[in-house]
Amino acid sequence: MRSWILGWLFCSLVAVMQAAPLPRLKVSENKRFLVTEDGKPFFWLGDTAWELFHRLDRRDAEAYLKNRAERRFTVIQAVALAELDGLNDPNANGDRPLEGNDPTKPSEKYFAHVDAIVKKANELGLYIGFLPTWGDKWNKKWGAGPEIFTVANAEQYGEWLGRRYKDAGLIWILGGDRPAETNSHREITRAMARGLRRGDGGAHLITWHPTGGASSSQHFHGEDWLDFNMRQNGHAAEFTGRYDQTRVDYDRTPVKPVLDGEPIYEDHPVSFDAKKFGHSTASDVRRPLYWDLFEGAFGHTYGHHSVWQMWSSAKKPVNNPLMPWTEAILQPGAAQMQHGRALMESRPFLTRVPAPEGIVPEAVETSVPGAGRYRFVATKDSEGTYAMIYAPCGRRFTAKLGVIRGEKVRAWWFDPRTGKATEIGVFKAEGERMFTPPNPGEDLDWVLVLDDVARKYPAPGSRALGR
């Protein structure tokens, strides 16, 4: 009898713990990162699931969310009024989101389905990056549309959503892959932001998802409602002209955190031209992870071309997905994202800054620091206790050991494919030293980690720092 009672109490405790709300998020004091309400660093590791609410039933949604939680994602980006004819094509239960496509008349049955998915995500420790609408509903530059938003109904809809999800674990993402080309577009965005703030009382952060190659900073950087900048560096595979723009937003004033909310997806037609460039691979999605982080981003979003659209053989495909979403969630790139998170969390988090000075340029600079797919980037903490250099390929390079302020440097190789670290050796923290990645000449990436020996940091990627 006693054992039964103890078992019941244990199960009850587990249930209560699972139901505990996720902590609120806020911008860090230095305006570079996100932290929880008690100041703990928050690493945004997002997955792109634009059609989650629209195309999946609850059972499939739960299976998807469990898969992402197991892979240590922290944010799921999903859209209430979805891109793929989300106003007129019913969801998995046969419900449409709005009565008569009127934003002031949301369907209770449709949003009850959204509620259930948000609740399950939160129970699994996942925040929702919640897009109230896709952009074709306010700028039908392309897509199904129709345009349904005005300044007045956008504010009403925003307030309704804010009240409904005030206590949920989420981040609001306005925009939706369309440019804010006119004053009307921008005023609709501002109105929806006002409504959200009024509805949730300021409980949740707000950002804006732009179109390809653009940023929220283009139109809204100085506005109070925009808590951090989101970029869409887009579906090209080259650093130059795309991922180098993360640093541009990092350097803006006033200072705001920056995130790449849509880099190249795994198994996506590269630059939308598969006949010329083929489809992206895991290595193509790993490179932007480290490019963005080392250029100053506070986190990163991953995407898979089949998963964003939740494609199955029963659905019309968009741009030739290679496999059903149920297979795509098992692709290697998704599992490898967590290693980048682990690496960042294994060193002091809130003092990290870009550090291009840690790389010694070669005489031919298109070799190192490089260009195109083969760009070397570096980061460090502002106290000089560690530094990292991302090598996108097996090309030797020279690092400045003096970026570490201690007397001695411990060097490691960190494998972005496995998350394993291997110690190289200990050197004086002065001068320059050449390093050759473990797979010289091969198209395999590595991270060189340099630590101040006196700090006694654990192996890179270790969770020993308690995050």
At which residue positions do the language-model features occur?
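Active-site mouth of glycoside hydrolases
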Residues: 22, 27-240
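Structured core elements
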Residues: 77, 93-95, 259-260, 301, ...
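Extracellular glycoside hydrolase catalytic/binding regions
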Residues: 163, 167-170, 176-329
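Boundary at the C-terminal end of the N-terminal hydrophobic targeting segment
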Residues: 17-19
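Bacterial N-terminal signal peptides
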Residues: 4-15
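Aromatic- and carboxylate-lined catalytic core of secreted/periplasmic carbohydrate-active enzymes
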Residues: 40, 254-257, 266-268, 281-425, ...
